[in-house]
């Protein structure tokens, strides 16, 4: 029957890895709607080292276009404020004691179109990664069939399974892209 040297489950996991990576990349695109993950790249000079913002403060989303950053240590407020301003996210903190409020500005039409292009680029990169996994799987199947480790019928059946898995993941990528595009273009 089928040799243990081909694992369709492993191929599916590798394809899902591309989807997970895409979700992370799309999550980082600023859409004009507040998200605590927007501040993930912010590094604060704290206690002699660079630390992620979420390790020195609590980030919440009290309103759709407002982020609230509650700094735990009063002495860190200025450092957090500086890190946010220096992060090139285009956010200006309004400080009230140990709480920094960040208004998320509206996106103009031109910026929305740029973000859609970036989202398409991310999705295409994910599709290419999935196709590479498919090609690796099909190459492995051809080698197994050539070495008589699996029959020609098994090779065709498994190649069909690989293609179905690929189509499924590509469809999922298209759905993620469509959702993000709708989110970006919604005013």
Curated annotation (Swiss-Prot):
Chief place of localization: cytoplasm
Cytoplasm in keyword set: yes
Gene3D superfamilies in the record: 3.30.1360.40, Ribosome-recycling factor (1.10.132.20)
Q: Does the keyword GTP-binding apply?
A: no
List the subcellular locations. Cytoplasm
User: What is the stated purpose of this protein?
Assistant: Responsible for the release of ribosomes from messenger RNA at the termination of protein biosynthesis. May increase the efficiency of translation by recycling ribosomes from one round of translation to another.
Family, according to the entry, reads as follows: Belongs to the RRF family.
Identify this protein by name. Ribosome-recycling factor
Which organism was this protein described from? Nitrobacter winogradskyi (strain ATCC 25391 / DSM 10237 / CIP 104748 / NCIMB 11846 / Nb-255)
Give the taxonomic lineage as stored in the record: Bacteria, Pseudomonadati, Pseudomonadota, Alphaproteobacteria, Hyphomicrobiales
Q: Which gene encodes it?
A: frr
